[in-house]
Design a protein with these regions (language model features):
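A residue-level detector for conformationally permissive "hinge/kink" positions
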Residues: 4, 40, 44, 61, ...
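Conserved phosphate- and dinucleotide-binding cores of soluble alpha/beta proteins
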Residues: 19, 87-93, 97-260
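N-terminal active-site beta-alpha-beta segment that forms phosphate/nucleotide-binding
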Residues: 14-130, 134-137
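Short, Lys/Arg-enriched N-terminal segments with co-localized hydrophobic residues
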Residues: 2-15
Length: 260
C-alpha cells in the first residue's frame, strides 16, 4: 500500500512518499523490490548503500533474488555512506566487513567497484576530499539506501546546528555510541569517530529510499518527516529531495498514523 503524506512547509507543499509495510520482513521485501527495479532499469547503476540493522533484511532479499537468477550485479557500482575511524577493513565490526558479509560476498558484484571510506586513513581532511571525489565522479548515487537513527541521524550525520555538505570526520554522539554498543564486547570498544558522507552528498542522489522499522524509530519518523526541516533532525532534509520514498512498518509509523 502506498500513501502520500502532504504537508505545508514555509513556501509551498512538500510531499513525502510513504510505503506502509506490515513488519520488518515486509519493509525488507518492498525495499528490495525497489532496488531490484533500479538495477533492471540501469544495470550499471550506482547504488548508495547503508549499514546497521535496518538494511540487513533488504540485503538478504537482494541475495535471494540473485540466487534465483532475478538479478545481475556484475555492472553495479556502490558507494557506502560511512565507516568507523580506526577499524581496519577486515575487523568484524568495520562497515567494509559488514558489506562483504551481508551482501558483496554473496552476489556477483565486482568488489573493485565497491567504494567505502577508508577508516584507517589518519589524514581526515585528505580522506574526506578523496571520498568526495569518488561520489562526485559518479554524479551521486542513482539510488541511495538509508536507515534512520533514533535521534534522526542519516549516515553519521548527527543532530547539529547546521547541515554539512560533503564527506566529514565526525565525533559520534553518546546516544549513537550507546546504540552501537550491542555490536561490541564493551562500550569502550565502540569507535568514537567516523567518516560519513555529508547531507549534500546524500542529496545528490537521484532517488533516496529510507527503510525504517520498530517503535524505537517512531519519534524520529515524526520529527524528521512531519516536523520542520532543521539540522537538529538531520533526516528532515529529505523532505526537500525530489524523489524520496520512506518504507516503514506500522510501529515506526505509529505516531503519525492519524496523518496518513
Amino acid at each position: 500500500m502506498i500513501k502520500l503524506s502532504s504537508k505545508k512547509y514555509r513556501k509551498g507543499i512538500i510531499t513525502v512518499r510513504i510505503i506502509c509495510a506490515k513488519d520488518y520482513a515486509d519493509v525488507s521485501r518492498k525495499a528490495a523490490n525497489i532496488i531490484a527495479a533500479q538495477i533492471h532499469l540501469k544495470p550499471n547503476c550506482v547504488l548508495g548503500l547503508a549499514t546497521g540493522s535496518s538494511p540487513v533484511g533488504t540485503y538478504k532479499e537482494l541475495i535471494a533474488k540473485y540466487e534465483n537468477g532475478e538479478l545481475d550485479f556484475s555492472q553495479v557500482k556502490t558507494i557506502n555512506l560511512d565507516e568507523y575511524v580506526g577499524l581496519p577493513k577486515d575487523h568484524d565490526q568495520s562497515y567494509a566487513y559488514f558489506m562483504r558479509s551481508n551482501l558483496f560476498d554473496h552476489v556477483n558484484i565486482d568488489q573493485a567497484n565497491c567504494n567505502i571510506p577508508n577508516g584507517m586513513n589518519p589524514d581526515a581532511a585528505g580522506e574526506c576530499a578523496r571520498y568526495d571525489a569518488v561520489v562526485d565522479g559518479f554524479g551521486g548515487a542513482d539510488l541511495q539506501l538509508l536507515g534512520l537513527g533514533p535521534n534522526g541521524h542519516i549516515g553519521f550525520n548527527e543532530p547539529c546546528d547546521e547541515f554539512v555538505n560533503g564527506t566529514n570526520h565526525v565525533k559520534l554522539t553518546d546516544s549513537t555510541i550507546d546504540a552501537n554498543q550491542r555490536f561490541f564486547e564493551k562500550r569502550e570498544d565502540v569507535p568514537t569517530h567516523a567518516y560519513t558522507m555529508g547531507i549534500g552528498s546524500i542529496m545528490k542522489a537521484k532517488r533516496v529510499l529510507l527503510v525504517c522499522n520498530g517503535e524505537g524509530k517512531a519519534q524520529a519518523v515524526k520529527d524528521c518527516f512531519f516536523g520542520p526541516i532543521k539540522p537538529q533532525s538531520p533526516g528532515s532534509i529529505l523532505q526537500l529531495h525530489p524523489d524520496f520514498t520512506l518504507v516503514a512498518d506500522e510501529e515506526a509509523l505509529s505516531l503519525v498514523a492519524d496523518l496518513l
